[in-house]
């Protein structure tokens, strides 16, 4: 064995498998410790300790194990956990999944070095989320409102325009009536080069890059880097929010790729699989990410999360959306049926939900009629959708005049309220006024979920 007490350097590599490397005869090694690795040809790589049993350490290699062998590879344990250097200068910059600049700009001179695992928020010090965030998307702002400090995921399907929606939210999101600086941190995991180019071009074209910090992990990057990307992004968000006092929106896409990387590494470690082959600790791992959203009593800033995940086979009961739903505070569901009709964004409001919406709307936050309008739109659209199924059986001629109105409302709701262009940024007032304009289609006697005073004040006169 070739070891050095000071540097703890080892050449006792016993196995190299997938993204993992096993080192024997180690002493004083800790979980999550960072390891400097030197390949036989002198190349420098980094890794992290996944597991320590007696004198054996299992290391995940960030850059992959290609060209590593058991004879001429060196591993040096640093005694440090993974950290990222953070600074205000990260605004408007692009980094890879492990925090290295990829935009051709200079290296970041950090104000602080922070552990990427963060520190848990004391539940007693959390403030309840209750400030409205305007995304400019009517189906979100009007009916599934995003609130500052909330975690609200978007459930999508393969081929649906979640990337376009994510880019639009990153461009348009803002906190109304708040002088605090607003920042967006965009973390992409396992995306293709085509998708990466789309996001880069979109942010640059619209000028949104000034307020966006991007962490980009590509599909051909190592899976272990994918595990670090959301932690890098959230650590930066915590610095912006709780040190610099910014209002931060974190968009994480695609959490399905993150979970696939978890499964790949778990399989390489020969762990006992859980549901559908995913590791049993996936719930805990996802909770560690999602629970880093929130507000802290006495701190100006906040972290709001919008994780995006693609449901395999559009299955909302799949372990990834299923576990995400347990941890987060609602969901925005994209519909393949609406997408086939050419509707963008194809948000299906009926299965969508924002559990914290009630605390962030009404009065001086949005408008006093917001809750009633939202409830009435839900009710009327649900009625119209039910009648569509009936029409398929009995035909439209069998419907009453009242039913015809609800059917017309459903069509107009999809064509005018849900549908908007990819560059259209609707204010909450425009969204609510549009809702009232559509409710005018229905007989006034059917508007049972809004107060009479609001009907008199806001319903357009014939």
Curated annotation (Swiss-Prot):
GO CC aspect terms: plasma membrane
Membrane topology listed for this record: Peripheral membrane protein
Subcellular location: Cell membrane
Keyword Transport listed: yes
InterPro entries linked to this entry: ATP-synt_VA_C, ATPase_a/bsu_AS, ATPase_F1/V1/A1_a/bsu_N, ATPase_F1/V1/A1_a/bsu_N_sf, ATPase_F1/V1/A1_a/bsu_nucl-bd, P-loop_NTPase, V-ATPase_su_B/beta
A Gene Ontology molecular function term of the record: proton-transporting ATP synthase activity, rotational mechanism
Main location: membrane
Biological-process GO terms, alphabetical: proton motive force-driven plasma membrane ATP synthesis
UniProt keyword annotations, A-Z: ATP synthesis, Cell membrane, Hydrogen ion transport, Ion transport, Membrane, Transport
PROSITE patterns: ATPASE_ALPHA_BETA
Keyword Membrane: yes
Highest taxon above the source species: Archaea
PANTHER family listed in its UniProt record: V-TYPE PROTON ATPASE SUBUNIT B
Protein family according to the UniProt entry: Belongs to the ATPase alpha/beta chains family.
Job of this protein: Component of the A-type ATP synthase that produces ATP from ADP in the presence of a proton gradient across the membrane. The B chain is a regulatory subunit.
Assembly and binders: Has multiple subunits with at least A(3), B(3), C, D, E, F, H, I and proteolipid K(x).
Protein's name in the database: A-type ATP synthase subunit B
Species per Swiss-Prot/TrEMBL record: Methanobrevibacter smithii (strain ATCC 35061 / DSM 861 / OCM 144 / PS)
């Amino acid at each position: 064995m070739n070891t050095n007490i000071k540097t703890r350097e080892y050449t006792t590599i016993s196995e190299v498998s997938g993204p993992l490397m096993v080192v024997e005869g180690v002493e004083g090694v800790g979980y999550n410790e960072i390891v400097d690795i030197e390949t036989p040809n002198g190349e420098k790589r980094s890794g992290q300790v996944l597991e320590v049993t007696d004198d054996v350490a299992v290391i995940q290699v960030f850059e992959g194990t290609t060209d590593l062998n058991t004879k001429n590879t060196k591993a040096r344990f640093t005694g440090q956990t993974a950290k990222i250097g953070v600074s205000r200068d990260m605004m408007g910059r692009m980094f890879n999944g492990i925090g290295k600049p990829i935009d051709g700009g200079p290296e970041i001179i950090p104000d602080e070095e922070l552990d990427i695992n963060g520190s848990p928020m004391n539940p007693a010090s959390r403030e309840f989320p209750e400030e409205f965030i305007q995304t400019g998307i009517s189906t979100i702002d009007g009916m599934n409102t995003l609130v500052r400090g909330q975690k609200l995921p978007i459930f999508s399907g393969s081929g649906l325009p979640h990337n376009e929606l994510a880019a639009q939210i990153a461009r348009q999101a803002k906190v109304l009536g708040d002088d605090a600086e607003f920042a967006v941190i965009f973390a992409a995991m396992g995306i293709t080069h085509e998708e990466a180019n789309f996001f880069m071009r979109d942010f640059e074209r619209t000028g949104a890059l000034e307020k966006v910090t991007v962490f980009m992990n590509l599909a051909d990057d190592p899976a272990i880097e994918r595990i670090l990307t959301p932690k890098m992004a959230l650590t930066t968000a915590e610095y912006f929010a709780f040190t610099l006092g910014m209002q931060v929106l974190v968009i994480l896409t695609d959490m399905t790729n993150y979970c696939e990387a978890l499964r790949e590494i778990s399989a390489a470690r020969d762990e006992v699989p859980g549901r559908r082959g995913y590791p049993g600790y996936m719930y805990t791992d996802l909770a560690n990410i999602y629970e880093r959203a929130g507000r802290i009593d006495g701190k100006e800033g906040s972290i709001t999360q919008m994780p995006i995940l693609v449901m395999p086979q559009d299955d909302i009961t799949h372990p990834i959306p299923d576990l995400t739903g347990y941890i987060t505070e609602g969901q925005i569901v994209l519909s393949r049926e609406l997408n086939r009709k050419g509707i963008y964004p194809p948000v299906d409001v009926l299965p969508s939900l924002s559990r914290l919406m009630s605390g962030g709307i009404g009065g001086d936050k949005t408008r006093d009629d917001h809750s009633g309008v939202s409830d009435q739109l839900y009710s009327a659209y649900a009625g119209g959708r039910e009648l569509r199924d009936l029409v398929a059986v009995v035909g439209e001629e069998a419907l009453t005049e009242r039913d015809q109105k609800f059917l017309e409302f459903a069509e107009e709701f999809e064509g005018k309220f849900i549908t908007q262009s990819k560059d259209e940024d609707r204010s909450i007032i425009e969204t609510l006024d549009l809702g009232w304009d559509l409710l005018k289609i229905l007989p006034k006697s059917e508007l049972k979920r809004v107060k009479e005073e609001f009907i008199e004040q806001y319903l357009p006169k014939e």
